[in-house]
């Protein structure tokens, strides 16, 4: 297959034929029919066309592949599937149809968990990476080879390589590369635990699995020299998602460029804060490109494309979340869409901008575009927060000198709340004690269920809870809000104000050049979505369940830390 033929094969209609082939084998074999079996059977039928016996087919397959996994798997299919079915498929379908099934079937909604990188995404990645014919391109987590084949065909890159841990996917990639007759180097391996700098890749791409739970992630990555030389894994709490991302960048040749597709949670998840700060402070992150939802057939969630290179003084941010073309039930990126995104990447416009370390620091290194482009709410579907509250007040203005006279180490049942005491979106349980509080400050005591929000950016928000036996005095750098519970669930408002949309509204209504603050007047104009009480309560119930789980984990951590300390003491 040359490049021209490869492009022509993309236009071959094969969905009906693929369905017919799968129907032929249903009931004839015990295992579940799948795209994995479909591609193998189509390859065997294609290979059998000039042959006349099973023995000749086995010999032909053996001459095509030198890796034991692919060879043994194809021999297994020849043994498992009634040979007359292979003969029938070979006789009934022409070469181009069989080749199209082998090369492109995942792009045409044949239901399977083996899916590849969509064509439009591949083209966008290669435009942004600026892949040239003399590049060595490495795909870490290469799956079924979609990105590799398209990249070889579209760019003519000198060397195209892939690493994949899943044997089935690697076999599909191997078969596809053979049918396309593209010289692609494929390797079975683990991109988290192994060093692949030997490929000397000038361009690296990765579309890794998302949301992977890897309990022993530190043990998995400790022998990956590429990663451990890039970052101190003992200093940073690296999640599996960021291990995939950083492993990709770590395998890039100096002077090269890396692109990683990842779901949006990595942009704001609290546990990844330090890693996000690190990649920006070190100048590793070149660009953040928010992509539209429904680009992948297997999920509707939106993804973000992270571009890495060296010595970046600013980060390019592109909000391309609305740039796509509808194609039946999914979205695709057409050539026009791609050029629009690339143009925004190269030059600032209404959907792109260059951001500094200080810009990200103000947002606590949350990287979602809505934080930086603002959010214009639809007022027709929202209600001003002032209409949902009984009061919005500022905390007590107490001088440092006066506060020193009021502070005590004794437990008095009266506490003092400062901005610093709001951690991880909740109020610190060990607040400082106060004594002899003047009656003029009694109006500033917080009540159970009040929302507390910092007066200045970055905006911290917390809910007052479990305070019935304690009085808490709010500082003047905080606002406290009494919600009208007859109109809205207070925790729903808390959730919304903590969201990207809520934070974007707060930022948009802030004033000040050095320190951004929001006035009570502007705070009252914040718009809250008009959800039914039932919808609010459902969301709040789930939210509070997650909070309980986090509290439990914190308590378990404290217990384990104490037991470890006691064990250490036994050594002495």
Functional labels for PLM-detected ranges:
Residues 131, 252, 446-447:
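Short, well-ordered loop/turn sites that connect or cap secondary structure elements
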Residues 214-224, 403-438:
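DNA target-recognition patches
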Residues 306, 370, 471-479, 511-539, ...:
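A short glycine-rich beta-alpha junction/loop motif
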Residues 32-111:
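Long recognition/docking surfaces used for binding and targeting
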Residues 6, 208-399, 414:
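A conserved structural/catalytic subdomain of Rossmann-like adenosyl-cofactor enzymes
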Residues 347-410, 423-426, 532-572:
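Non-catalytic DNA-recognition/assembly elements of restriction-modification systems
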Residues 109-206, 211-212, 262-265, 275-276, ...:
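Conserved S-adenosyl-L-methionine
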Residues 441-444, 448-498:
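A short beta-sheet element
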